[in-house]
């Protein structure tokens, strides 16, 4: 039903991933999610037979706005500006890796002074949902991260540039991407009552247990 692509990109070697998913290698999946590299799938072709959610684009950051706009103009197409892993927690993990490398190279034991602060789930949801006795997984996820909304905003911005006769360049793409830095699921703690089944789904998705 769902094909999620997370591989590295290569044009050579025994198993090149360039155009791994294409007209010649069309997936049977109803939904294709690409968060690897834009060149891994021919998204303009695959969107004709599958719902495609694309987070990465050909020739980033020197993208082709017209190609992306044409892709997003399909009813089966959704796209975001390379933000799949663009969270505060991922940045913190990068800092931890850099700090570890520094300590290893210079035989130091420098520690971070700042510690990760979790955001409460209740602060991410509207009041009508936090007060609901029937919380459901889909409603929570759509409130915490509405990728569909981001896709609509992305397309609208491309259209705005096009209408104004301006070129949407690499700097504009990076500016948009940086504006979408967000709380990852692992940055959020569960502080609302919910049944065991829902709690398990939330924790499997990365949400943290609330500790008083």
Language model regions located:
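NAD(P)-dependent dehydrogenase/reductase Rossmann-like domain
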Residues: 63-64, 75, 88-212
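Glycine-rich loops and low-complexity Gly/Arg-rich segments
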Residues: 9-11, 56, 77-81, 102-107
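Rossmann-like adenosine-cofactor binding region
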Residues: 1-69
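A generic structural signal for short coil/turn motifs at secondary-structure boundaries
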Residues: 12-14, 86-89
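Short FAD-binding loop at a beta-strand-to-alpha-helix junction that anchors the flavin cofactor
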Residues: 69-87
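Short, hinge-like loop/turn segments at secondary-structure boundaries
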Residues: 4, 70-72, 96-98
């Amino acid at each position: 039903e769902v094909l999620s692509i997370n591989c590295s990109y290569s044009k050579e070697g025994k198993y090149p991933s360039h155009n791994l998913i294409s007209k010649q290698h069309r997936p049977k999946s109803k939904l294709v999610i690409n968060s690897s590299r834009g060149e891994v799938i021919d998204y303009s072709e695959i969107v004709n037979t599958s719902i495609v959610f694309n987070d990465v684009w050909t020739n980033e950051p020197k993208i082709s706005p017209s190609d992306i706009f044409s892709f997003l103009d399909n009813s089966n197409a959704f796209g975001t500006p390379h933000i799949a892993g663009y969270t505060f927690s991922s940045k913190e993990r990068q800092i931890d890796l850099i700090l570890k490398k520094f300590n290893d190279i210079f035989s130091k034991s420098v520690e971070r002074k700042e510690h990760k602060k979790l955001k409460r789930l209740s602060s991410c949801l509207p009041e009508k949902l936090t007060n609901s006795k029937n919380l459901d997984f889909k409603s929570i996820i759509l409130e915490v991260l509405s990728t569909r909304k981001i896709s609509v905003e992305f397309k609208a911005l491309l259209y705005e540039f096009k209408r104004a006769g301006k070129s949407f360049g690499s700097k504009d793409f990076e500016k948009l991407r940086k504006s979408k830095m967000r709380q990852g699921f692992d940055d959020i703690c569960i502080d609302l009552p919910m049944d065991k089944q829902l709690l398990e789904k939330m924790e499997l998705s990365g949400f943290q247990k609330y500790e008083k």
